[in-house]
Amino acid sequence: MRLPREIGPIHFVGIGGIGMSGIAEVLCNLGYTVQGSDASDNANVARLREKGITVSVGHKAENVAGADVVVVSTAIKRDNPELMAARAQRIPVVRRAEMLAELMRLKSCVAIAGTHGKTTTTSMVAALLDAGGLDPTVINGGIINAYGTNARLGGGEWMVVEADESDGTFLKLPADVAIVTNVDPEHLDHFKTFEAVQDAFRAFVENVPFYGFAVMCIDHPVVQALVGKIEDRRIITYGVNPQADVRLVDLTPMGGGSSFKVVFRDRKSGATHEISDIVLPMPGRHNASNATAAIAVARELGLSDEAIRKAIGGFGGVKRRFTRTGEWNGVTVIDDYGHHPVEIAAVLKAARESSNGKVVAVVQPHRYTRLQSLFEEFCTCFNDADAVVVADVYPAGEAPIEGIDRDHFVLGLRAHGHRDVLPLPKAADLAGIVKDLAKPGDLVVCLGAGNITQWAYALPNELKALG
């Protein structure tokens, strides 16, 4: 039995979240009656309202009146008044991943998982399937610039989804094709141990049906070890690793992007195939690696070399992934979502490759627990930044942890050998600090998953106001 068409209003608690809003938008496009609530207005809420979805600001018990089902994310606590009202009225309550799984059952699905790179890789797979005329349905964890949204309903048989591992619910997703970009210690508040994280990714791959396949990056040692443990599913490996089935070669940085080749080697027949002259308009080896994963899927689904080149060459990127927000006096300001040490190091390396000037990093650490558990890694991931400006920790709902704060982080970076680290007293001081640090040709990279994105968009005009 599939999701019935005659189901009544579907109410989303926390509809403005990036994951929830995408599912709500696709359900609305399918003709279901969708409504929801969120703690505050945001761009996602505004976009959903434009589609005719009723969104209430604030959580109140009466918001769920008349709903046939209530969808909640893991961020919603048990004492939320709408969740409590739904349970009191015996309205079925489902988690975000369960509703996403229901949508996935309507199509053949590619699900993209990994500690980093999910959103960009999901967007690239979508762009490739679009270019191949497959018209996919897409539900992503970020705004795809080509769509202006994180979700779209396509007319084809394929769906492309970002599989969020943060709470373990990605194991509910019925993927026909799985991508695993990397596996690093993250979300230990849920998983408790890194071994549990690895076990979850193994189960994710083993959930793929016998007629499906998984695409896995063996440049990452944990993923390569995982490949060795999976016996009963078809695996396609990718990366710069000489042993990869789909190998990234001749990667050459060029301006704000890169060019490369991809070589395919069939383990059964020994046959090889090469796609050369691929140009990706995004900098960084990590983005070329993400593109290689997407290309591996595209070729398996029958796309031509020319369609692959065209899709990658025209890829418009994802909001908050190395997004240029403006310029001042020859200084370019970049906004990036990177908030884990591995992501930060990759973004700064890409910045270094795409600039002849200095790289100034502005970082807003995200969550006290993350800064505490990965402190050593945070103190060594800024080597490609000539200067680092450190803001206060963005709590994301967490209580402060004594001794884990901006100043402790500044001291840690200096102790680990960084030559130029400054604390940011308050957001209003950022423009003045950047004005003194940056010269024409430099890149200012704002990093974090909190409200630093607002600073990144305001900064060019604030610098202009200073003269």
From Swiss-Prot:
- Where exactly are the transmembrane stretches of this chain? none
Q: What is its main location?
A: cytoplasm
A GO CC term? Answer: cytoplasm
Q: Which residues form a coiled coil?
A: none
- Give the UniProt subcellular location, in the record's own words: Cytoplasm
Q: Which Pfam families match?
A: Mur_ligase (PF01225), Mur_ligase_C (PF02875), Mur_ligase_M (PF08245)
Where does this protein act, in terms of pathway? Cell wall biogenesis; peptidoglycan biosynthesis
Q: Does the keyword rRNA-binding apply?
A: no
Instruction: Name a GO molecular-function annotation.
Output: UDP-N-acetylmuramate-L-alanine ligase activity
Entry EC number(s): 6.3.2.8
The entry marks the following residues as binding ATP, namely G114, T115, H116, G117, K118, T119, T120
* Keywords linked to the UniProt accession: ATP-binding, Cell cycle, Cell division, Cell shape, Cell wall biogenesis/degradation, Cytoplasm, Ligase, Nucleotide-binding, Peptidoglycan synthesis
Q: Which biological process terms from the Gene Ontology are attached to this UniProt entry?
A: cell division; cell wall organization; peptidoglycan biosynthetic process; regulation of cell shape
Stretch forming the signal peptide: none
> Which transformation does this protein catalyse, written as a reaction?
UDP-N-acetyl-alpha-D-muramate + L-alanine + ATP = UDP-N-acetyl-alpha-D-muramoyl-L-alanine + ADP + phosphate + H(+)
Q: Do you know which PANTHER family this protein is assigned to?
A: UDP-N-ACETYLMURAMATE--L-ALANINE LIGASE, UDP-N-ACETYLMURAMATE--L-ALANINE LIGASE-RELATED
According to its UniProt entry, the function of this protein is described as: Cell wall formation.
Indicate the family of this protein.
Answer: Belongs to the MurCDEF family.
Which named protein is this?
UDP-N-acetylmuramate--L-alanine ligase
Natural source organism: Bradyrhizobium sp. (strain ORS 278)
User: What gene is this protein translated from?
Assistant: murC
